[in-house]
Design a protein with these regions (language model features):
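Noncatalytic carbohydrate-binding groove/subsite architecture in carbohydrate-active enzymes
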Residues: 1-90
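Active-site proximal loops enriched in glycine and acidic residues that flank catalytic Cys/His/Asp
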Residues: 27, 63-66, 106-110, 177-179, ...
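Aromatic/acidic polysaccharide-binding cleft in carbohydrate-active enzymes
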Residues: 58-140, 151-157
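C-terminal beta-strand-rich structural cap/linker in extracellular carbohydrate-active enzymes
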Residues: 214-237
């Protein structure tokens, strides 16, 4: 994991810190379950607070997997196959990492029944070599957040987890939204200037990176998008 016993001595030693490019670690021990407080929230707050201490250097999440129920012989116990589990674990964790100034998210591992692609294990939710739901979740961030700088994003909807990004020359804005509820939302985006939506895709329990519905609000500075229940939706402007 990312433990203060290891990272603090480096951060607090000028000579060691000068030889450091990246602070990297894993996010086990329930990083996403901050509502329970205590140890989990303290770990989350510590890790997400690293950025302010790094003086322009970065922190990376370097390994995680979500495989609850894998040891059971009963398929009903294989939680990692369920869409709501994938969205509420991998999706939520990547979102929280992006909010916490993380610069790279690496999942372990790529081709495995609980990973990004199916394998020949009987527990695999998709055929060998096919992209699983976790793969589509990660691809939203790979396509819409890579090589960008995160910018502030606010939403009045507590169940709509949103991050926004801008490219290096400031000509392209992207938004990734996780709708963590049973209700569809007609979301109005407010980028602060006239824009054209050039791409909008959504992944749900039954769809993978399919075109999302763009809503014409009659205002080029406030484009709209329909965000389906329990979905991840990404928009490029």
């Amino acid at each position: 994991g990312t433990q203060p016993d290891y990272t603090d001595p480096v951060l607090n030693n000028a000579e060691a810190f000068a030889q450091t490019d990246i602070v990297a670690g894993h996010l086990y021990q329930g990083f996403i379950d901050v509502e329970s407080g205590g140890y989990v929230k303290n770990r989350h707050d510590y890790i997400c607070g690293l950025y302010k201490k790094l003086n322009g250097k970065t922190w990376w999440m370097t390994e995680h997997l979500f495989n609850d129920g894998e040891k059971s012989d009963n398929q009903a116990d294989w939680q990692f196959q369920r869409w709501d589990y994938c969205l509420n674990h991998l999706g939520k964790e990547i979102h929280m990492c992006m909010e916490g100034y993380c610069s790279a998210y690496i999942y372990w591992y790529l081709k495995r029944f609980y990973g990004m692609m199916g394998d020949d294990d009987k527990r695999s939710p998709v055929a060998k070599g096919e992209i699983a739901k976790n793969g589509y979740i990660l691809s939203h961030y790979a396509r819409f957040a890579s090589n960008t700088t995160r910018v502030a994003a606010e939403t009045p909807q507590s169940k709509l987890l949103t991050t926004a990004y801008i490219n290096a020359d400031g000509t392209e804005l992207t938004v990734v939204m996780l709708n963590m509820q049973n209700q569809a939302l007609n979301v109005t985006l407010n980028p602060g200037c006239d824009v054209e939506v050039t791409e909008a895709v959504a992944t749900t329990e039954t769809a993978n990176m399919q075109p999302a519905t763009i809503v014409d609000n009659g205002n080029a500075a406030q484009p709209g998008v329909l965000v389906e229940p329990w979905s991840i939706t990404s928009v490029r402007m």
